[in-house]
Amino acid sequence: MRRHLITILIILFATISSNNVRAQIKNNGAIGSVTIDGKIWNQVAMRPLVPIGKFAVAFDLVIYFDAEGKVLSEGWDFSSASSIKNTLIDKIYYIKFGNPGEATYVRIGALDKLDIGYGILVNGYSNSILYPQDRKIGLTFEKNNQNIKVKAFINDLKENAGLFGGRIHTNAIMGIPIGVSFVTDRNQYLGLKDSDNDGRPNIVDDFPYNNKWWLDTDGDGLSDYDPNEWDIDGDGITDTLDSRIPGYVGDPLVLDDNILKKDEPINVNKDSDGIMAIAVDLGYPLVNNKNYSLTIYSQAAQMVGRAMNPETKKIENLGIGIIPLGVASHFGSLKFKFEYRLIPNGRFEFDYWNRLYEIERISFARNSSNQILLRTKESSLGNYGEQKGFFSGASIDLGGLLLADFSYNDMRGNLWSVKDGQFMETNNQTFLSSLSLKKGFSRLKRASAFYQQRNVPNPFKFEYSESTIIGYNVGISMGQGLVLNYIFRRSFRDYNANGRIDGDNETIDITSIETSFIF
C-alpha cells in the first residue's frame, strides 16, 4: 500500500510542478490534526489549485496517521478495481469549468451548496457535510442560453449516482418563465458507510471489516455461520453434536431445537428503497435591473413514494406541496424571499434535499429484540399531516466585511405525536443562519459560523435533534504566510433509536486544527 501511495504522490507532484502551469498554481499546504470517526489523526496535506484556462483543479492530497505512525488506509486502498477508482478520485476536491450562470459550467467533486430552481425540492444541499470522514465526489452541470437553462447534479460518483436530479427552465412558452424539476434517490441506504462492501452497512454489520461474515447473535466474536460457532444464541447449550466438536465421532445429534437468532441485516445491494419527486415553477420578473429586482413566482411539487400512516397503519402515497405565491427581491446588497406554503394532504416536506440530507437520509429504530433497524427519511413523511404557513429568508452583505444569511419556516398543522398516539395540531418550524467574514482584518484572516435546525416545534429552544447542525471556522495569521485554522462541525445521530440525543455517544464532532501555508 505504501508503494502505491508514494508512486501516486510522485506523479501528482510532478504534474502540478510542470513549467507550463507552475506560475499559475496556488500551492497550499497544511499540517495539523483532524477527528475522523471519533479518533484523532495527524495530517499532512497538500492542496494545490491548478488553473488551466477556464478549467481549475483543486487537489486534496492528505495523509492521516495516528500517534504510532499508522497510516489511515481508507483513503489509500488499492485492493480492488473499485477501491483504486475511489482512491484516485478522492484526491480531487473539485474540478470545474467556467462559473455558475455562464453558458457552460461543470463542477466535479465537493458540492458545498446546491439549489435547484426556487428550492421547493433542493435547497442548500451539500455532499460535503461530513467531510473529511465521508468524501463524496459529486457532479453539477449547467447549460444556459437566452431561451433555455438546464441544470443537473449527482451526489456521488463513487456510489454510482445514488441521488441525482435536474431542472429545465425556459421562457419560450408565451413569454412566461417556466421550470420543471426532477429529483430521485434511487437507494436511500447508500448514504451509510459499508467498509467491507458486503452490502451490510457498518451500523448493522457485526463484522464491518470482514465481507465473509455479518451476523453474530450472541456477540462472542464468532459469526453465526462460522463452523467454529457451536452455540449460536449463547444459551449454554451446544446446538448440534457433529464432527466439528473435538472427540465426537457419532452421527449428528441436534441438542438445541430452539435457537433464537438475530434477524438478518439488510443487504442494500439487494433491498433498495428509492424516492423521487417532480416540481413545476412559474416566475415573472416585475422589475429587473442591476440594483433592484422583484420577481413573483409559484411552485408545486409531488413526491413519489410511500410511507405508513402511524394512525391507521396503512401504507399511503406521498403528498404534494404548494407555494401559491412567492416573492424574491434584491435591493443593493440585500436579498429577500417570502413564500406562502401549503401541504394539503400531508406526507410532504419542503426543501426535502437540504444541507443535512446526507445525515437525515437514514435514521435508526429498534425492534423487539433491541436490534437496530434502518429507517429512510421517506418513511418519516408519514408523520406529517396537513400543514400551512410561511417561509422567509434574507441575505445581506454588510459593507463588504460580513455576509449574513437567515431563513425561517413557520408551519402549523397536524403532526404525529408518539406520546399521545395521535395526530396533534402543533408548530413545525425550521431556522437556518450563517455569518461569514468576507474580508480579513488584522490577524483574523477568515471566520464563519452556521446553525441549522429543521422540523421542530421551536428551533429557538436549541434542543438538539438529528436535524441540528452547528459549525464554525476561524483562521488566525501567525505571520510569515502561516495561518492557524480551527474548523469545527457538530451534528447528531440517534444511534440507540430512543427518540432523543443522549450525550457524547450520539454527537458527531468533526474537528480540524491545522497550520496552513502557501508556497
Label the model's feature ranges.
Residues 7-16:
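Bacterial N-terminal signal peptides
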Residues 95, 505-519:
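Outer-membrane beta-barrel "beta-signal"
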Residues 15-24:
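Bacterial Sec-dependent signal peptides at the C-terminal "C-region" and cleavage site
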Residues 25, 39, 69-71, 102-103, ...:
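Signature for the C-terminal beta-barrel architecture of outer-membrane proteins
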Residues 1-4:
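Positively charged n-region of N-terminal signal peptides that target proteins for export
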